[in-house]
Amino acid sequence: MFYKNDQIAGFDDSIWQAMEQEDKRQQDHVELIASENYTSARVMQAQGSQLTNKYAEGYPGKRYYGGCEHVDVIEQLAIDRAKELFGADYANVQPHSGSQANAAVFMALLKPGETVLGMSLAHGGHLTHGSKVSFSGKIYNAVQYGLNEATGEIDYEEVERLAKEHQPKMIIAGFSAYSRVVDWQRFRDIADSIGAWLFVDMAHVAGLVAAGLYPNPVPIADVVTTTTHKTLRGPRGGLILAKQNDELAKKLNSAVFPAGQGGPLMHVIAAKAICFKEALGEGYVEYQQQVIDNAREMAKTFQTRGYNVVSGGTDNHLFLLDLIDKGITGKDADAALGRANITVNKNSVPNDPQSPFVTSGLRIGTPAITSRGFGLEEAAALTGWICDVLDDISNEQVIDDVRSKVLDLCEKNPVYR
C-alpha cells in the first residue's frame, strides 16, 4: 500500500542525496549548454503526477485501453495548444523525444535505403540528420551538406548542387549548432525542384518561433519536428507538426504509434500542454527576445576579447566559439570552465582537426541564464570571466577567482525564487 506522504528521503537516501546534489549544482553553476533550460514548477508538478500511472495506447477517442476519458482531455488540449502556438493544422504530441519524432518522420515518408540530404554533424547538424552512427545514416542513404567556409553560413549553392546530383527523397533543414537564420523558403524551392519532401527540425529555435522572433517553418515545410525543452522551456519530449494533409497525418500518426512507440507518457503530455499555455501567455515574447539579446551580447564580448565566433555572430540563442587559433581544445576549455562553475559543452567547429571527443570549440547558449534573470550586464560580465579562464587556462587561481564571482552571481539570481 502507498501513502500520499511517502518521501524518497529516508527510503532511498542514495537517490535522494544525488538529487539534492544535482539541485545544488543547478543553483551554484551557470548553465550555458544551448539545449538546456529550466522548466516551471507547474511543468514539474505535471511530470510528478498520478498521470504516470495511466496507459493510453492510441489517440484521443481511439484508445486500446479503458479509463482514458480524462487523459483524452489532456492530450487534446496539448494538441490544440501546439497547433495554435505554431499555426499548424496537425500536431502529434506523443513522441518521447526529438529523435523519436524525427525517426517517425523518416518512417512515414521514406523506404529503407532511400536518399536523404541533411546538414553534416561536423558543421552543426544533428545525429538524426544522416550521421553514420544514427539510424538516419544506417538505414537510409545519407548525403551531407555543410557551411560556406568563408561566411560560416549554410552553403545553399552546395545544397542545391547535392540535391540535383543525388536526387534525395527528403531534404532536412535544421540544426543543433548553427547561429544564423535559416532560409526555409530556399530549402523549399530546392526540394520542389527535385520533387523531394522538405522536413524541418526546429528543435533548437522552437521557442523563438513561438514568440515570432524567428521565421516559422510550419507553413513552408511538409513536416516540422521539435523538442519541447530547449528554448520552448517545457519537459523533455518531442512534437510533430504539419499543414493540412489527411494522408500525411495518417502516416505520421501510424509511424509514432504503433510503429515507433507503445503507450504515450501522459504525465509528460500534460507537462507539454502546460508549457504550450505558458508560451501563449504574457511575458513569453519578452523572455525570448532577452535570450537573443543575451546571446548577441556574449558573442560581441567574445569578439572584443579576440575570440573567433563562427559566422561572426548570432541571430538566435546560441553560437559557436572556435578555439583553433587559441591552441585550446574544446575538451580542455569545457573542463576548466566546469571547475569555475560554468557549464558549457565542447563542440566541433567547421573543418575541425580534432575528434568529436576532443573538438576545437564550445557551443554556448543563453536560454537557461535568461530564465534565471540574467540580462545584458550579467551576460557581458560572464563572458569576460570565461575569457579570463581561457586566456590562462592552466591558472587555477584565476579559475578559483572566477568561481567565486559565479557563486555570487548565482546567489543573487536563484533558479527558483
Swiss-Prot record:
SUPFAM superfamilies, per database record: PLP-dependent transferases
- The signal peptide, as residue positions, is none
Report which reactions are catalysed by this protein.
(6R)-5,10-methylene-5,6,7,8-tetrahydrofolate + glycine + H2O = (6S)-5,6,7,8-tetrahydrofolate + L-serine
Q: Name one GO molecular function term.
A: glycine hydroxymethyltransferase activity
Cite the InterPro entries for this sequence. PyrdxlP-dep_Trfase, PyrdxlP-dep_Trfase_major, PyrdxlP-dep_Trfase_small, Ser_HO-MeTrfase, Ser_HO-MeTrfase-like, Ser_HO-MeTrfase_PLP_BS, SHMT-like_dom
Which pathway, per its entry? One-carbon metabolism; tetrahydrofolate interconversion; Amino-acid biosynthesis; glycine biosynthesis; glycine from L-serine: step 1/1
Q: Which family does it belong to?
A: Belongs to the SHMT family.
Protein name, entry field: Serine hydroxymethyltransferase 2
From which source organism is this entry? Colwellia psychrerythraea (strain 34H / ATCC BAA-681) (Vibrio psychroerythus)
